[in-house]
Amino acid sequence: MPLVKRNIDPRHLCHTALPRGIKNELECVTNISLANIIRQLSSLSKYAEDIFGELFNEAHSFSFRVNSLQERVDRLSVSVTQLDPKEEELSLQDITMRKAFRSSTIQDQQLFDRKTLPIPLQETYDVCEQPPPLNVLTPYRDDGKEGLKFYTNPSYFFDLWKEKMLQDTEDKRKEKRKQKQKNLDRPHEPEKVPRAPHDRRREWQKLAQGPELAEDDADLLHKHIEVANGPASHFETRPQTYVDHMDGSYSLSALPFSQMSELLSRAEERVLVRPHEPPPPPPMHAAGDARPTPTCVSSAAGLIENRPQSPAAGRTPVFVSPTPPPPPPPLPSALSTSSLRASMTSTPPPPVPPPPPPPAPALQAPAVPPPPAPLQIAPGVLHPAPPPIAPPLVQPSPPVARAAPVCETVPVHPLPQGEVQGLPPPPPPPPLPPPGIRPSSPVTVAALAHPPSGLHPTPSPAPGPHAPLMPPSPPSQVLPASEPKRHPSTLPVISDARSVLLEAIRKGIQLRKVEEQREQEAKHERIENDVATILSRRIAVEYSDSEDDSEFDEVDWLE
């Protein structure tokens, strides 16, 4: 419905009702018509004055804008004409310190406001009937809303439009985030290699020489793989086996020097396991104890020196494990093949007689067994048998942490009695771990190549070659002299000042988060009825969405 800005009254000059009792009606109508014409002329002159006043105001504002634009052009022309090319145009400091350009012009918005209401419309508005005085009830409302807005609300349509615009902008942002999350969650598909076209020319070429000379497709494929990846090594194609009987020609003492060195070189690359058995589980450590799996070797030089180099030295009987022991870990990097081979060149001592078989389990439970000693095995033994476990006399303490897999230990040169007595006492054993960790294997574990920082290996004098194998004693049966000592903590004590400082830092971080949240809320509250801000934000979101959609379309097209 159009709004009538100016209404000229009276519209009908002669359409009037004549009063009763008038004798000369023609004269009365003429006078009334002339009066209405005069009223129309006065109304027209008044509106003409309003129109010319508005034109004058518009011309004045236009002149002001033109003058301000002319001043800006003059300043720019002076700066352009008087620019010295020898001087530095713009320093880096000016670029970083200068703020971004922001226009000072105010965009025209909220055109239909009470302040911009024309005078004729204001007069028409004043003629209208007044609404009921509901504003008197506004101070008594708890929700803070104006009472008159329930009867008439001029800003209702603008608020409805503003809510719709902001909701559309937020929906577009949510859709954009959802699309990005979907692209991140989507797994990276491998590049699809196009299938080569089927060509029967190669088959006909193979059959042209005769079916006898035609090569098998599997052989061709194997050749292509060898050409692409290189020939496979011998130890990779050879199946891994487990030797159950090491007597006779399988004994290490009966091997020649060349075969023995070959076996030692392969020991770093291959681990023998019994077939049809799964590999042992990895060692379990305490939570947070991330350390590499320790590799262990006990007196590897003694293993090589105790082996005779000539096969004529005789065959040594070998004790073989009746139960499948876990495989040993690979040799450490510090023990190279060259050092092993160099140690083989030394003069070997006379062969050591084999140890006696392990005693019966009933005889291996002494009243107070000695501390665990390294397991001693004769040359040629690959996997020792785990000795039986002595029954605990008292309630066992928390189980010891599970150590690395069982390693092959070999005898070392026994020390003279004087040297054994002159050695310092061994340090105390490592402290027990918290309960819940799996107990260690009954077989004595060799020295660790990379022990953790919290544990200290306990070196003990090696017994003679004829010493019987003794089972390790449970943790509860260890002598009182070897109880773990309580070392004082080396961690620095946090003083009250440091705790106060940490608390202040935490509070500062929390305050910073609260301030950032308030700034975001203030930005949202700053919108209010700014039409230009709402429209610019909507345009920016739509523009970014259009760019993202084009990128997604390109990705889908490439796929």
Swiss-Prot record:
Cellular component aspect of the GO annotation: cytoplasm; cytoskeleton; dendrite cytoplasm; focal adhesion; lamellipodium; mitochondrial outer membrane; mitochondrion; postsynapse
Main location (coarse class): cytoplasm
CDD domains in the record: WH2_WAVE-1
Entry keywords, A to Z: Actin-binding, Cell junction, Cytoplasm, Cytoskeleton, Methylation, Phosphoprotein, Synapse
Signal peptide residue numbers: none
Domain comment, as recorded: Binds the Arp2/3 complex through the C-terminal region and actin through verprolin homology (VPH) domain.
Protein family per UniProt: Belongs to the SCAR/WAVE family.
Subunit composition and interactions: Component of the WAVE1 complex composed of ABI2, CYFIP1 or CYFIP2, BRK1, NCKAP1 and WASF1/WAVE1. Within the complex, a heterodimer containing NCKAP1 and CYFIP1 interacts with a heterotrimer formed by WAVE1, ABI2 and BRK1. CYFIP2 binds to activated RAC1 which causes the complex to dissociate, releasing activated WASF1. The complex can also be activated by NCK1. Binds actin and the Arp2/3 complex. Interacts with BAIAP2. Interacts with SHANK3; the interaction mediates the association of SHANK3 with the WAVE1 complex. Interacts with ABI1 (via N-terminus).
Official protein name in the record: Actin-binding protein WASF1
Lineage of producing organism: Eukaryota, Metazoa, Chordata, Craniata, Vertebrata
